[in-house]
Amino acid sequence: MNFHKSFQLNGKTFANPNEIIDFSKEISSEIHLFLKDWFSEKRILEVKTSGSTGLPKTIAIKKEFFINSAMSTAEFLDLKEGTVALMCLPPKYIAGKMMLVRALVLGWHLDIVSPKSNPLENNDKTYDFSAMVPLQLEHSLLKIDQIKKVIVGGGVVTSQLQEKLQGIQSVVFATYGMTETVTHIALKKLNHFLPSVGFESFASFYQLLPNVKIYKDTRNCLVIDAPKVTEEIIFTNDIVDLVSDRHFEWLGRFDNVINSGGIKLHP
């Protein structure tokens, strides 16, 4: 598995995969092990689910699905080669792993900090992109303008938090997805809305990433057909309203159980 020539990790450039693997030892054992697997001959990687909506389990994901997910995010958010990104999510789960893959595949300059509630503490650098959970976003509001685009998942963004986002320069998106779909398959803008045209603005709903189709089952729950990131049709327990063939509104859980301690809505 190759990597983009523009890829940088914590300010360092690399000539070959072995240099990246060796350097990652200094960062964390979890990242080191993932990168060893990523650059190995394996076509499929095992990833643990967070257990947000059920018992934690391990699932197998093709490397090509990781790459396809990275490309879709970059296309949707217009994140090009040389994007300066901050990784502040744990590498144990898919959201953290995908920050690494996006950087490797797309040629980003990635800084990694330990996952904590205020990842911008003692950091005055400006970034093009980062992914956070709501707790991190809440604790970073005073400095969040250092990041141009932020995706947030792993829990519900409260109306109080969204209200606070209206006065910041950063553009913030809520994510919808899961480990089985290799993080998000849809994003919803949380601020910087354009004036509504017509009855309602699509900006207030989740918008699908490229190569994703959705419909509802008999329970009114979302069904996901995303062949670029999963070979299976995903039947969820998320009750939705289909606003268009590209937009939906999340209404709640069919089983009415949400464990916000895990990462369900992955960035």
Regions found by a protein language model. Name each.
Residues 1-26, 67-86, 116-128:
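Conserved ATP-dependent adenylate/AMP-binding module captured primarily in the ANL superfamily
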Residues 30-48, 82:
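Conserved pre-ATP/AMP-binding loop-to-beta segment of ANL
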Residues 44-68, 78:
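Conserved AMP-binding A3 loop
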Residues 62-68, 84-139:
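AMP-binding/adenylate-forming
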Residues 133, 154, 177, 238, ...:
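Active-site glycine-centered loops adjacent to acidic/histidine catalytic or metal-binding residues
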Residues 140, 144-195:
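Gly/Ser/Thr-rich phosphate-binding loop
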Residues 213-241, 247:
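AMP-binding/adenylate-forming core of the ANL superfamily
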Residues 237-267:
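AMP-binding/adenylate-forming catalytic core of the ANL superfamily
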